[in-house]
Amino acid sequence: MKRFINDMEKYYRYAVYSAKAELKAEVAGSYLNWIWWILEPFCMMLIYAFIFGFVFDAREKYFTAFIYVGLTLWTFFNQNMKNSVRMVKKNKSIISKVYLPKFILIESKMMVNGFKMLVSFGIVIILMIFYQIPLSWNVFYAIPILICMWIVNFGLMTILVHFGVYVEDLANVVNIVLRFIFYLTGIMFSIEHRIGAKHPELALFLEKFNPMAFLISSMRKCLLYGERPELLGIVSWIGIGIVLTALGIHTIYKNENSY
């Protein structure tokens, strides 16, 4: 772990530089530039709000904001998982010429997706003002929730980065699994109210053992409903994320010469 910390300090500036370069490259050839980072999830929010609000008659409180919070966090997680599978192969031209810890590639990509997520949170603030959602001190729990999500994402990505080198079809498998998890995470509905009404054991299982379901639900509680999230759950997932990170970093260091 000491080597990991030293390498993170040594190559952190590269991660920041790489993230900035990627963000600039994304908007360079676009007429709307960075506005797409807001426009895309906003349009998806409107689509899901129409389908589940009017067609399926979902009626969660502050429904539009409810969906957008879920989509914002899910997009961060979804993009990170998809990007990590082919990360080493995609950056083969760089890592074959100079030594670069593979987890620095992960950190750089997370910075890119994290910046987009923070931009999207601007819409969340606007929606909170629109709905006149009363603020409480519980909104500050959003910070440990985001830290927890970052650690869990990083840990999962270190593992996917390794196996993505050797398993050619892993990207297809990950896409299918992510689509399945999407519908079990409660992006467009409340797991507690919708699933819990008929299957309380399943709802409890999903909220306890699906990290994104737990984190999205926790974020909604502190931002939209003025409630305190389950602190033990946040601490537990931070611990799990640290364990995943330790396993992933150990695996990367052990096999990096064969990548």
Predicted regions and their residues:
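Hydrophobic transmembrane alpha-helices and immediately adjacent juxtamembrane helices
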Residues: 1-259
